[in-house]
């Protein structure tokens, strides 16, 4: 098996461990590492709050909403599984039986799990917000691919507060936000 000429890391903006492992692998094997970073979508408006992590999101949500929609998936949501949030949180996540079982084992009631594949249109986000009487939506700053513009638009139109978890800082040796630029530069 031949070693690759270079590695392009196009993982999720919040997949830090995978990126760290790839950078270490590339450093060890002396292979060029290139990061494709999804472009961030500009997020502005009233009732939008930025936080650094899931714990800060939980703290902020305590004061913002009675009915919260987590659009973060099923990982690292422990701060929302405490007494303060019982009966208040709906978790939108991929329809993976293992992930659903994991949440059920943590005591999340089935009625609080929305297992569905996204990303979603503005109208689909609005339908979920209205169906569950959501007054606070929590998302990650995961860009267009993560459906962030549609989530923000839906929440704004319905007057729902939004908590956005900012992307974690990571010092990538080489990083691009344009797929075509990576292809053009590195295909030569």
Feature roles, as predicted:
Residues 48-55, 174-185:
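Short acidic-hydrophobic, aromatic-tinged amphipathic segments that line or gate anion-handling sites
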Residues 49-63, 72-75, 120-122:
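Active-site glycine-rich loop that binds ribose-phosphate moieties when present
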Residues 8-9, 70, 139:
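Redox-cofactor binding/interface segments in oxidoreductases and associated redox assembly factors
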Residues 5-6, 67, 135-136:
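Structural motif
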Residues 104-127, 131-132, 136, 141-158, ...:
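A C-terminal functional module that forms or caps the active site or interfaces directly
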Residues 1-57:
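Glycine/small-residue-rich loop that forms an oxyanion/phosphate-binding "nest" at active or ligand-binding sites
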Residues 98-99, 161-173:
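Short, flexible loop segments at boundaries between secondary-structure elements
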Residues 71-113:
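Anionic-ligand binding region
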